[in-house]
């Protein structure tokens, strides 16, 4: 999960 880059 990467809310700052992909949102996933």
UniProtKB/Swiss-Prot annotation:
Lineage: Eukaryota, Metazoa, Ecdysozoa, Arthropoda, Crustacea
Keyword tags: Amidation, Neuropeptide, Secreted
Transit peptide listed as a keyword: no
Predominant location category: secreted
Residues with the Phenylalanine amide modification: 8
GO cellular component, one term: extracellular region
Protein name as it appears in the record: Orcomyotropin
Origin: domain of life: Eukaryota
Localisation per UniProt entry: Secreted
Gene Ontology terms describing biological process: neuropeptide signaling pathway
Stated role: Myotropic peptide, enhances both the frequency and amplitude of spontaneous hindgut contractions. It is synthesized by abdominal ganglionic neurons.
Species of provenance: Faxonius limosus (Spinycheek crayfish)
